[in-house]
């Protein structure tokens, strides 16, 4: 079953976890939920400093992004209606809907222009790579690493500079469980909504059941994840009657 990083980790626990990580390089057992602890440990293993930046993080040039979009044209074309649906459901909530490929490369984003400006400051924009190796614990990278939908809220992000975000992501898989990409909803952490995980998970799962091109998909035509997924997106479909609003 999908496993989110919820319930939300208390702020005091997160502060203590950061202190231990910086002072000792390790965390006491039970301080963080297991999925979050695993992601933070992976992030530390990549040599990332929680309070630092990410020098050397890859970012596609305009030409490279154009080639990636062409390479992933079927994924992009079929994801677009889902992204537009999520934008409509979350309008006025200071958020972005993001499509990434199976390596964490951000392909497209739609949503609030004001929030997009803030997101730019932490490279949450098309062309950037949000694999855990470069961004630490984050919904896109952690969903790829765990092969399951995740929520990463506020200070649960490994890098402190991403703490203003609340992000929900779900892998997009083919019928065999192979990850083709990630659908993500990112916004201001003050506007988190309790139904966001169900909405994003349902959107990714629904598209998995109806995209006619997936039987024709092959590894030679799309990027593949660096690790084997633990499972495909599961869960009952959610019928959304009203757009979500920030609290």
Please give the residue ranges for each predicted region:
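Helix-to-coil/beta transition segments that act as allosteric "coupling" elements at the rims
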Residues: 157-171
């Amino acid at each position: 079953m999908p496993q989110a990083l919820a319930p939300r980790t208390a702020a005091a626990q997160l502060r203590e976890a950061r202190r231990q990580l910086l002072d000792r390089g390790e965390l006491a057992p039970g301080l963080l939920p297991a999925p979050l602890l695993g992601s933070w440990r992976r992030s530390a293993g990549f040599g990332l400093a929680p309070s630092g930046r990410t020098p050397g993080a890859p970012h596609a040039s305009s030409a490279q992004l154009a080639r990636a979009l062409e390479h992933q044209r079927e994924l992009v074309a079929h994801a677009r209606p889902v992204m537009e649906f999520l934008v409509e459901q979350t309008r006025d909530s200071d958020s972005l809907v993001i499509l990434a490929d199976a390596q964490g490369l951000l392909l497209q984003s739609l949503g609030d222009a004001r929030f997009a400006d803030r997101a730019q400051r932490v490279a949450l924009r098309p062309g950037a790579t949000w694999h855990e190796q470069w961004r630490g614990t984050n919904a896109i990278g952690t969903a790829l690493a765990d092969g399951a939908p995740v929520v990463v809220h506020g200070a649960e992000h490994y890098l402190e500079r991403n703490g203003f975000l609340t992000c929900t992501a779900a892998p997009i898989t083919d019928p065999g469980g192979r990850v083709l990409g990630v659908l993500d909803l990112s916004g201001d952490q003050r506007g988190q909504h309790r139904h966001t995980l169900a909405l994003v998970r349902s959107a990714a799962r629904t598209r998995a059941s109806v995209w006619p091109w997936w039987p024709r998909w092959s590894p030679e035509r799309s990027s593949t994840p660096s690790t084997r997924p633990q499972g495909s997106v599961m869960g009952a479909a959610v019928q959304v009657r009203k757009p979500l609003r920030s609290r």
